[in-house]
Amino acid sequence: MTAALVSGLLREGYSFAAQPISDLGIGPNAWIMNASLIGTGVLAVIFALGFRRLLPRLPRKGLATGLLVTFGLCFAAAGIFPEPSPDGPVTIAGIAHFVLGFFIAMSALTVALFLIASGLRKQRGWDRHASYPRVTAWLVVALILLTQLFFNRSSPLFKLGIGGLMEWTLFTTWSIWFIVTGLTLFRRGTRNTRNSSSALSGTTAAVTPTKEGAP
């Protein structure tokens, strides 16, 4: 999101409130936005693999991980296939951009969030974290609908010119979830490793014989 913000600030005449974020993927400095999409997708895949390793007992973990990986790959694809020019014809790359980078990516992420929330609620020590992915999932659903309504030219809401603001809010919402959850997993993983090392050291000390009568 930081790269997209920088790209928007560098783009003369770009409206954060009215224009889609994808508009930054074409025209001057488009590489900043497209590289950001690819990088974010790769990071989401890495997150999914770390999530799978650090939560071994999560119910339906495999499905949730697969959906997060799908989200990451599709989001990265949005950077590989930028949207078409507004004045140009519909292209296969443009269709791939919207279908993969938005509809499939957002659908996969939403379902994954609901699965994660359900699984965390049943896992000891993580139940208090279950509400955050659930709330995030519902916010994502609501913001997707609002984004489509505000960008739909046949909708009376289109005249308000805040479709871009809705999309920025959507992307910020799920980005914060990834950051907060990633930090939580890292902190817990570090703590568990430290506790395991301490327990191993204590066990080793307990079974090591004491040498008596040594000169």
Where are these regions (language model features)?
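Hydrophobic, aromatic-enriched alpha-helical segments typical of multi-pass transmembrane helices
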Residues: 1-20, 24-190
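Short, intrinsically disordered terminal tails adjacent to the first/last structured region
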Residues: 194-215
